[in-house]
UniProtKB/Swiss-Prot annotation:
Originating organism: Drosophila melanogaster
UniProt EC number: 3.5.1.122
Changes seen on gene knockout: Defects in long term memory after olfactory learning.
A cellular component term, taken from the record's GO annotations: nucleus
Protein family per UniProt: Belongs to the NTAQ1 family.
Name used for this protein in its record: Protein N-terminal glutamine amidohydrolase
């Protein structure tokens, strides 16, 4: 893969297990700081559904040969500089970092056709600059009733916006018309970020 990567090495990136929404916020922040001209081509992508049960393959936390796991939600970063050059940066995947969009979607989400409707995946796509401004989390979702942590939090302070102490639920929600960005089904998500070579050839005739 020959591309001018935004993040040359995965070790350059801020990462804390089970805080994917903050890991992606930090990627957006890094682009704004080091490659601001690329920020408008970057997105934070939340994947979830109404029941918060979404199967993903090729995940570090997954089990079996297919490394499948069922998350309540997951978040990854995409950089879309040119048609069919869209790259996915997922700090929790076992696929290369980054991976081209089509390969990532094919291996991570496969197809909804073989899944029960309650496991169908939906995607909230938020422009990186919007995500940097509007995302806010006091990490309450990672605390047990007694106040102890389910998983140790990042060492840096919580990411809090000026207008909202905790709005993570608005990003995980997959209801159209609520929350920032746009919500897509799996097929709509693919159509927005990938065009097959056959379709491109037809359009160029």
């Amino acid at each position: 893969m020959t591309t001018d990567f935004l993040f040359p090495k995965i070790s350059d990136c801020s990462y804390v297990s089970c805080y994917c929404e903050e890991n992606v916020w930090k990627l957006c922040e890094q682009v704004k700081r080091t490659r601001p001209e690329e920020l408008s081509k970057c997105y934070a992508v939340f994947v979830s559904n109404e029941g918060r049960t979404v199967p993903l393959w090729r995940q570090k936390a997954g089990r079996g040969d297919d490394q499948v796991v069922i998350w309540d939600y997951h978040v990854f970063f995409i950089h879309n500089p040119l048609l069919n050059r869209c790259l996915v940066f997922d700090l929790d995947t076992t696929l290369p970092f980054p991976t081209y969009f089509h390969k990532y979607v094919t291996e991570t989400f496969r197809s909804d056709l073989a899944l029960r409707p309650e496991h169908h995946r939906f995607f909230r796509v938020i422009p990186a600059d919007t995500y940097l401004i509007e995302f806010s989390s006091d990490r309450r979702h990672m605390r047990r009733p007694d106040g102890s942590w389910i998983k140790p939090p990042p060492s840096y302070p919580p990411i809090l916006s000026n207008s909202n102490m905790h709005c993570l639920g608005d990003f995980i929600c997959m209801s159209a018309g609520k929350g920032p960005g746009s919500v897509y089904s799996l097929s709509e998500f693919v159509q927005n970020f990938y065009k097959s070579p056959h379709v491109m050839a037809q359009n160029n005739k």
